[in-house]
Design a protein with these regions (language model features):
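Acidic, Ala/Val/Gly-enriched low-complexity intrinsically disordered segments
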Residues: 8-15, 23, 27
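Short, flexible hinge/linker loops that cap or flank conserved catalytic cores
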Residues: 13, 31-34, 158
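A cross-family phosphate/adenosyl-ligand binding-site feature
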Residues: 30-131, 169-204, 208-209, 215-225
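Arginine/glycine-rich "motif VI" loop of SF2 helicases in the C-terminal RecA-like domain
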Residues: 88, 154-162, 188-190
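Glycine-rich phosphate/nucleotide-binding loop
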Residues: 138, 159-162, 170-175
Length: 225
């Protein structure tokens, strides 16, 4: 059973301001305020192993069952759809943010508690970051990598102090972590930079830490990106 309310599509400009208000008025009377809000980056494909979709669903269930809110890219395909569906089914709120150009390609999820349609990828990422209190990267492709690295860079530069997690399911990110250590050994990354990302293979343990530490503020200065 879905708990998502009727979505409101928000376009940029003056109209979007009104629509954002309507979303808020629609949602508040029926749902409790979330105790934390985790932005999940993940693939719009399901991947070769069914375990990836199961992992995304497990992540969404945990968020919903613990009174949280999912912020994500607004699509219904792949891991994105799996994490959103599971959050909704577990009673959680889901905030989807998707560019107009991807509404058809990524099949915008009309069951979201809030579904914001924006013009650009920059607007998408900034709104997702602003609505989140923590970030988590699941397995995915270059879009997932780009979002993860940008969020990490923003943290390094001091634009936010929100926790960042990397779920290294079944060694999916082993190669990436090895390369990052290589970059550090070659002097391109400071030793404390890796400490800004919480890496774990167990979703529940990682999610608990992210939810518990989700109290950092996202600086408006990040809008310059």
């Amino acid at each position: 059973m879905q708990t998502g309310l009727t979505p409101v599509f928000a376009a940029p400009g003056a109209v979007s301001s009104l629509l954002f208000i309507l979303v808020s008025l629609n949602a508040c009377p029926f749902m409790k305020e979330p105790t934390f809000s985790i932005c999940v980056y993940c693939g719009s494909r399901s991947g070769a192993d069914p375990a990836f979709a199961a992992l995304a669903a497990q992540t969404g269930r945990w968020i919903g069952q613990h009174g949280g809110q999912l912020v994500y890219g607004g699509g219904k395909n792949g891991l994105m759809g799996a994490v959103a569906d599971a959050t909704l089914q577990a009673g959680g709120r889901v905030i989807g943010v998707i560019p107009q150009a991807l509404v058809e390609r990524e099949h915008a999820h009309r069951g979201c508690t809030e579904l914001h349609v924006v013009q650009t990828m920059h607007e998408r990422k900034h709104l997702m970051a602003a609505r989140a209190s923590a970030f988590l990267a699941l397995p995915g492709g270059i879009g997932t990598f780009e979002e993860f690295f940008e969020t990490w860079t923003w943290r390094q530069l001091g634009y936010h102090a929100k926790p960042i997690g990397l779920l290294n399911h079944d060694g999916f990110y082993d190669g990436l972590l090895s390369f990052l250590r290589h970059s550090q050994a070659q002097g391109f990354m400071s030793p404390d930079l890796m400490a800004l990302v919480d890496v774990d293979t167990h979703p529940a343990a990682l999610l608990e830490r992210l939810a518990r530490g989700a109290d950092g503020e996202f600086s408006p200065l990040a809008a310059v990106f």
